[in-house]
Amino acid sequence: MGYEKRSLGSFEGRKIYEILLSLGYDMKSAQRICDKHRVTDAEDQNLHKNSVAHGEIFLIDYKCEPRGLKPIFECDAFAVFDKPSGILSHPSGRNSPYNMYDEIWSLYGQDACVAHRLDLETSGILIVAKDKDAARELKECFEQRRVMKSYL
């Protein structure tokens, strides 16, 4: 897994967020992309949302490289994976190795997220929310301790 740099095209005199909106991103997504410094110019300089484009611009985007790990259970709202030891629950930066998000996003898209974390060395059950509503509900369940976690 990793991030890849792909061209969004060549633009002159337009603000970065306007370009992202014209390419189909909603305002919230465009802002998040800019806030995470994922838009650059040809010299790899980060472009902020109000920066004005002069030439080709690039998006640094997550590239999933799934290995075929499948959920052991799933329903409409969430999925359950048996996370092996030695795999990160989530990426830890742009040079992150294979992690559970390679599987999660390739199966459910980028709105899916882990409901809790397991350490790199820890194997066990990992609950994945398939969308933002499910993520909010699962987070609340963990916060209110309606979900029991145990370690062997």
Regions found by a protein language model. Name each.
Residues 1-152:
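RNA pseudouridine synthases
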